[in-house]
Amino acid sequence: MNKTEFYDVVIVGAGPAGLRCAEVLGGTDLSVLLIDRKVSVGPKTCAGGLRLPDGYFTLPDHMTSTFGRHYFLLGGKEYSLPLRKPLHIVDRTDLGRYQLDLIRDSKNVIVETGTSAGHIAADHILLNEGRKIRYRYLVGADGSNSVVRRSLGLGNRLYVGTQYIIPEAHDKLVWFFNPELLGSGYGWIFPHRTFTSAGVFFNPAIFPARKAREALDKLLQGYGLHFRDAKLEGAPVNCLYKGIKFNNIFLTGDAAGLASACTGEGMVYAVASGDDVARHIIDNSYRFDRIRRLLKYKKRQEFILYVFDKLPRYRTSLFRIFISLLRRPAFQRYYSGDF
């Protein structure tokens, strides 16, 4: 019989949320086990857009491509807009390695890759090969198909991002709004340092994946971006938020449904929630301040999406109004805050 192990905190998932949670818990008196089912930390289908949270999470300049000016295409016209908060484009493999390096010297944190979570109970979790781990706190940071979320009986509302990985760096960050092709979804071109992500984000409940792929091809053909030999990949994004704390079990990032259904943005929510959960575990009086702020912007963005979904005849006009409003720093602050 396998010996039962014990950790104060078990974190399932070594993405941005789980790694940030482990980093904040590093150096404390708490014993921490961070597991991930993948052998390598970092790789994930993701466009890579990240608005760096002010004051508590930074990345070296050499890791990102940074864009303060964005280009929006609507109705055959290109609009150029400066944004008050630049968007940083980061490769998820690089981000994972960087975050992992931040916890390597934390003697109270053990990282195990190639380790899957199975049955989950209120005080223990079963891993592959029958290992039983007892815990005081369990943190679900295991993405949109979260095992931890499923153990809590919570459903999902999944959106989808589909992208080509083009092996050359484009020079502009571009957003496509085309209601005839994408409904209330959008397309993007996100240039990384050595490659480009070009994709679409959509709701599969009202917009079939096949149509989304066709729309993406048409958008990129019209823009003149060569993609025929590029790798195509896709991933679900859970946007149904039901809470973070469930007694001694916590959800973070996409496992918590924190990503915005309007933009698909998830990394800033992941980092903030991993940080908040760790702080709450250390000090139970801490009330998840960063996530409460971010949820305010998620709610605003998803209300705008709701209006677009309910008024399909007026989407082109609504997109035009939206672009016009984005020219105003006050609206940018209202829409996405200071994160």
Where are these regions (language model features)?
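Beta1/beta-strand and adjacent pyrophosphate-binding region of the FAD-binding site
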Residues: 2-17
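Central beta-strand plus flanking loop segment that forms part of the substrate or channel wall
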Residues: 49, 145-176, 231-238
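Conserved N-terminal helical subregion
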Residues: 56-59, 63-151, 157-162
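Active-site-proximal substrate-binding core of FAD-dependent oxidoreductases
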Residues: 240-242, 279-316
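Glycine-rich FAD pyrophosphate-binding loop
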Residues: 10, 14, 26-45
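Conserved N-terminal glycine-rich FAD pyrophosphate-binding loop of Rossmann-like flavoproteins
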Residues: 38-61
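FAD/FMN-dependent oxidoreductases across multiple families
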Residues: 116, 206-280, 286
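Active-site substrate-recognition segment that forms the wall
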Residues: 178-207
